[in-house]
Amino acid sequence: PLEALKDRGYWYPSLQYEPTIARWLTEYNKAWGEWLSTSNSWQEAYYQIARTDSRFELDTDRYESPEHWHSWNDFFARRLRTPLVVPHQGMVSPCDGVLMDMPVKTTSVEELSDLLTGSPYKDVFVGGKAIHWVLDVFDYHRFHAPCAGTVIECRTIEGIHAGGGVIIWDAEQHRYRYAQLAATGFQSLETRGVLIMDTLDYGRIALVAVGIQQVSSVVWNEAIQVGTKIEQGQELGLFQFGGSDILMLFETDRELTTENNKPMKVGEKLTINN
């Protein structure tokens, strides 16, 4: 944090939120993202390096053949080898990632309005509940429908390409370190995709796919449009390179039973009490 930038109305007094620098970072990172979709961004050597780390799960039968990867983004957003099959009734995780429980009752109307910028449905989630997945670079970076429903809103909100957190002084390690926050604050600044569904069992739910840091790319499947009837487990979209979060918002009368900081896989069962 910089003292000179305090009291300027920035989300955090850091240069990445200063408008001129934020615009340049956004332009630079978009250009970088375009390059990461070219063949020059990918080499066989990168695949062999990734194979040595079991967290990528490349030596399992989970993912498609690497012959389909012709760019870094092809690899990063790699498909599953077989279509996702959801054997559960009820709600399932829309993605891989670490699950975090977040009470929306501590989030102001203004913050939700920022997160769902311009949505006519934003007020129905105030006082409700939210859950939040943080995706790691090793995770599967496509996201799927957590339940069946009808799309009533689907769009992408362009944001700035900031760091998705703050830099703090770690007195124990005697160095500055990056601290990602689990609140809905910084997500309201990032590029994000907003999908709101009307569901039979859970009322209206919002799925917010947040592209955090650097490229911040959220790509919806072309078939996902307002009025589309979605099946549980259906692929909704993907993240290209950059940090990735998924948030789900529920109406006020829904109760969730979740285990905080729990690693999950896409399609894994969630406990939602009607």
Predicted feature locations:
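Contiguous, well-folded functional domains in the mature portion of proteins
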Residues: 1-274
